[in-house]
């Protein structure tokens, strides 16, 4: 069960209640505003005692108001005040249950994340580093026009249209340069692998 909070409302919650006096709404929404003005302080105090957290109080209050507004004045039955209190209480109880579920499930979530992080691939091995170094050297050996296209297209992952615009060439030319660069890189890396 939640701890019993102090009955003194924090400033932010008092500001919510005080703001109800100056609120201006359409005529068809006056019913909800009158409920909020009449019972606002009491339900916010109820939520404060129930939840003990300003943010949770505001969330529950907003949830209840949104649900009541969506339901409409006619959907509240013969006792709108009682319905208002019940809606606010239900919103508060939902937050308490969500906290309970969070506390119950959080250790399992942490364990899954820990296992997932252990399953991730280990840092690059020596072979991978050597291969990356060879690829970098091969890219540096390419002619400038091919190197520019391969860097922009493959490393920066830009679309051909943007690569072409940056380099001042046509899309088809960018595609052709990329193809040529890949063929040359494959040849260079293959030559180094099979001397």
Q: Model regions: which residues?
A:
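A short, charge-rich alpha-helical start-of-domain segment used by transcription regulators
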Residues: 19-45, 55
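Acidic, proline/glycine-rich intrinsically disordered inter-domain spacer in sigma factors
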Residues: 21-22, 30, 111-140
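Short, small-hydrophobic-rich alpha-helical interface motif
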Residues: 43, 47, 57-68, 84-87, ...
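Arg/Lys-rich amphipathic alpha helix in sigma70-family domain 2
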Residues: 86-108, 128
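DNA-recognition helix of helix-turn-helix
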Residues: 89, 161, 167-193
